[in-house]
Amino acid sequence: MTQSLPLLNGTEAYKLVTTQGLYDKTVKFYEKYLQLVHDKRVGTLTNSLITLKLVVDNSFKPLDVVNDKDWRAIVSSALVFSCTNIQHFRDLAAGETIQAYPNETNPIEIYLKDPNGYIIGITETKNAISIKPTLPKQSVEASLISSRSSRIDIASSGVSTDSSYPAIPKTAKAQKSIAVMTSGGDAPGMNANVRAIVRTAIFKGCNAFVVMEGYEGLVKGGPNYIKQVYWETVRNWSCEGGTNIGTARCKEFREREGRLLGALHLIEAGVDALIVCGGDGSLTGADLFRSEWPSLIRELLDQGRINKVQFDRYQHLNICGTVGSIDNDMSTTDATIGAYSALDRICQAIDYIEATANSHSRAFVVEVMGRNCGWLALLAGISTSADYILIPEKPASSREWQDQMCDIISKHRSRGKRTTIVIVAEGAISADLTPISSKDVHKVLVDRLGLDCRITTLGHVQRGGTAVAYDRILATLQGVEAVNAVLESTPDTPSPLIAINENKITRKPLVESVQLTKSVAEAIHSKDFKKAMQLRDSEFVEHLDNFMAINSADHIEPKLPEHTHMKIAIVNVGAPAGGMNSAVYSMATYCMSQGHKPYAIYNGWTGLTRHESVRSLNWKDLLGWQSRGGSEIGTNRHTPEEADIGLIAYYFQKYGFDGIIIVGGFEAFVSLHQLERARENYTAFRIPMVLIPATLSNNVPGTEYSLGSDTALNSLMQYCDIIKQSAASTRGRVFVVDVQGGNSGYLATHAAVAVGAQVSYVPEEGISLEQLTQDIENLTESFSEAEGRGKFGQLILKSTNASKVLTPEVLAEVITQEAEGHFDAKCAIPGHVQQGGLPSPIDRTRGTRFAIRAVGFIESQHKVLAAEANLDDDDFDFDTPKIIATASVLGVKGSDIVFSSIRQLYDFETELNKRTPKTIHWQSTRTIADHLVGRKKL
C-alpha cells in the first residue's frame, strides 16, 4: 500500500496530541498502518508527502468513541488518507475494529481508531466527495452472481451485489464461509432466522451458504444441496411461513458414514461454520458432528478423499444452534422460534370454538401438540381461561385427574358458566404413564357430567401460516447473534445455543441445554415428576401455579388466613391496550383464591370522582374477559390531579382500599407519581401502589415491555404484510405507513424488523433532508436492481411524531417526485387499527403474570406500611427507602422482572417533556433493522 496523495483537504502537516504513556503505541500505529517514519529528535512521523507532529500533553484524555455507531457522524473531524490498494489495508487491519463503507467486502473507505481515539480514514477515491475508486476492483464478469429466490431452486443470474450496503464494525479476523440449515419439524419464523443469518454473514465479509433439506442435504451434498446465497436471495423471507430451504428427517446422518459424507461435502463447498435451526434432536446431531470433526477429516485424508491442503484448512468446524420448535421444549430458553406462532393459532381456534360452545352450552376437548412438553397446553389454558388442562409434567392418577376435572367443571357450571374447554397435550399421561387421549376425556365428560361434548384436534394447523411478530423478531435477533457467535468461536469454545431470557438474547452451552431438555423426558418416563418440574424453567412453574390459582378463584377455601385478607382495587388509565382485561381478570380471580376482595374503578379517575364508579368484582361477571380486547372497565387519560385528587383520597378511605393496581401507559405512570407525592397530605394513599405498564407505545420508564405492545405489533405487521403485497403486485411502488407510538419509535422499529421495511423514521432521530435524500437513492437502487425479477414492493414506516412537517402524504409526494417515474409512493394510515382487536397470547399471559406479581407485591408491602400506620404525619418518614419502595412500577429489565420505585424513575430516569424514558433499550434493534435491509445511515 502506498499513500499517493496528501491529506484530502490539502493539509500536509498536522498535530496530534497524545500522552507519554500512549506515545510509543501511537508511533507503532502510524508506522504500521500509514508506513510513516518516526523521527525521535523532533517527534514527527513523515513520508515524502505528509508530516504528523506528536505533541505530548499528560493532561490529555483519549477520546471515547463508541463502536456501534457511525464514527463519521460522531467526531467533528477525521484524518483521511488516499491509497492505491485499500484491500491491502483491509488485510493489514484484520483483527482491529474498523468501519468500512459502503461495505466490508468491497470498501471504498475504511476507518479505524488510533490509540488516542482519533479517527483515521483510508480511501481509494481521489477527493473527499467522490464515490468512485481510483482503480477498478474487479472485472464486470466477476461481480455477476446468483440472485433470484425460489422455494425450489435458489440459483439464478445477472444481478450484482456490488450495491452500497451499510457497514457495521468488523469482528471477524478472517473471512469465513457460514452455512445455515433448518432441521427437524418446521416452525414459523425459520425463514426470518435464515434471512438474518445470510445477510449478517454477508455484512461481516463472509460467504453465506444454505444446506437444503436439512441433514439430508449434508449427506447428499453437491451444488444442488449446499448452495451459496446472496443478499437478494432471501428478500421478503421473513414474511413467509415454514422454511424455504426445506427440512427432512435423515436416518443416514445418525450413522458415522453419513456424518463422514457430511464433512466431505462441507469441505468441498468450502464451509467452515454451520448454524443449525432445529429442535433438540437436530442440535444434538450438530454437536456430535462437531465433536467428531477432527476424526472425520483425518479419516477422509487417509482415504484420499481430501488433500493435505484441505485437511489443514478445515481443522475445526464451528457450530451454533438456534432453536426452532413449536413445542417450546428447550431448557435454558424462555421461548423457541415458532412457539408463540403455534400458541397464536391455538388461541385463535379456541376463541372461535368458544362462540359455538356458548351457543349450545357444549363442552369441547381440544388436543394440542406437545409430546414431552405441556407449554402450549398450559399457556393456551391461561390465554383462553380453559376449565382444565392435561399436561405431561403434572400427571395425577387415573382416578384423581377425572375427579379433579369433574369437580372444577361442575363448580364452574353450577355458577353459571355455559361453556367448558378442556385442553389436552398430545403427550398427556396419568401417574402410571398411561396415555390420556382426547377420547378418554370426552368419555368422562359425557358419562360423569352428562355434557354435550365434542373433540377438536388442531393438528398441523398449529405449524402453519406466517410467524407472529414476536417470532419474526426473535428469529432475526437470534440469527444476528448466531453469526456473531460463530465468528467469535475458537476451537476450544463450547458450541453455543442462542437463547432468550425475558427480553435479553443470551448464549448458553448447547450440550448442557440439550442434556437438560432430554432429562425432562427421562424424568417423566421414570415417573420422577417432581424432578421434571424442577428441570423446567422457573417461568413454566410460575405459569402453572398461576393457572391453578385463577382457575380455582373463590370455588375453594382461600389460601390465606382471614386476618390477612385485603381490599385491592384496580384501575385502567390511558389509551386502551391489549392485555388490560387479562390483567383485571387475573388480578380478581387470584385475589379470590387468596381471600382478598377485588374492586374495579370504572372509567378511570374521573369515573371515580364524578360517579363513584366502584364495584366489587365477582367471578361470573368476569367470564370471557381474559380473551377480550380493549378495556371492559373503561379507561381515559385523566390523571388524579386533573380529576380531583382530594376526592379520590376520600373514596379510597370510604372503601378502605389496602392496595391499588394501576394498569396503563404514561398517564398511569404520572398518576402513580401524583398519588405517591400526595401521601404527605392524604393518609388514604399510604398503601402499596403498583403500576402495570400497558401501552402500545412501550414508553413507560422502568420496563422494556408494556402490555399491548405485542398486540399492536401484530396488528401493524398484518396490515403491513397486506400493504406490501399490494405494493409488490403493482410493481415499483412504495407505501409510506403512518405508525402510532407518540414520541417513542419502539413500534415502528420492531415492525420494521418484522416486515422487512426498507426505512423506518422515529421521533428519537427525526427526519433530516440529507437522510431522506439518501433513503430515496437507496430505494432507486433497490428498484433498479429488482427490475425483471418479479414482484417487488417496499415499505417505509414513519412514526407520527418523527416529523410534523413531513407527514406521510408529503413524504409520498416528495418520493414520487424524486423518483422521476422509476417508481411511485403512496401513503397508508392504519390509525387506531394498531390498538388491535383480540389481545395476543403474549399480552394475555403476561397480563396474567404481571397482575399476580402485582398482588404479591401488595401483600408483601402491606406489612411494611402496616407497621407505620399508627404514626402521626410528623413521625411518618416518607423518604425512607422501604417506604419509597411501596409505590413501584412493575417492569421487565433484561432477563428479570423487577419493581422500581416511582420516585427514582420519575425524578431521574424520565424525559417528562417527551414522555419517554431517558434510556432507549431498543437502540441496538434499530441498528439491526437498518443493516438487514441495506439502509445507509448518515
Curated annotation (Swiss-Prot):
Residue positions of the active site: 327 (proton acceptor)
Record region (N-terminal catalytic PFK domain 1): 1-552
GO biological process per UniProt: canonical glycolysis; fructose 1,6-bisphosphate metabolic process; fructose 6-phosphate metabolic process
Coiled-coil portions: none
Reaction(s) catalysed (UniProt annotation): beta-D-fructose 6-phosphate + ATP = beta-D-fructose 1,6-bisphosphate + ADP + H(+)
Regulation: Allosterically activated by ADP, AMP, or fructose 2,6-bisphosphate, and allosterically inhibited by ATP or citrate.
Pfam family, one: PFK
Binding of beta-D-fructose 2,6-bisphosphate 1, residues: 733, 826
Cofactors required: Mg(2+)
UniProt keyword terms in alphabetical order: Allosteric enzyme, ATP-binding, Cytoplasm, Glycolysis, Kinase, Magnesium, Metal-binding, Nucleotide-binding, Transferase
Region (Interdomain linker): 553-566
Domain of life of the source: Eukaryota
Pathway it works in: Carbohydrate degradation; glycolysis; D-glyceraldehyde 3-phosphate and glycerone phosphate from D-glucose: step 3/4
Binding site for Mg(2+): 280
Sequence positions that bind beta-D-fructose 6-phosphate 1: 362, 454
Residues engaged in binding beta-D-fructose 6-phosphate 2: 325-327, 369-371, 426, 460-463
InterPro entries: 6-Pfructokinase_euk, ATP_PFK, Glyas_Bleomycin-R_OHBP_Dase, PFK_vert-type, Phosphofructokinase_CS, Phosphofructokinase_dom, PKF_sf
Function per UniProt: Catalyzes the phosphorylation of D-fructose 6-phosphate to fructose 1,6-bisphosphate by ATP, the first committing step of glycolysis.
PANTHER family in the record: ATP-DEPENDENT 6-PHOSPHOFRUCTOKINASE, PHOSPHOFRUCTOKINASE
Summary of subunit composition and partner proteins: Heterooctamer of 4 alpha and 4 beta chains.
Family the entry assigns: Belongs to the phosphofructokinase type A (PFKA) family. ATP-dependent PFK group I subfamily. Eukaryotic two domain clade 'E' sub-subfamily.
Protein name: ATP-dependent 6-phosphofructokinase subunit beta
Organism: Kluyveromyces lactis (strain ATCC 8585 / CBS 2359 / DSM 70799 / NBRC 1267 / NRRL Y-1140 / WM37)
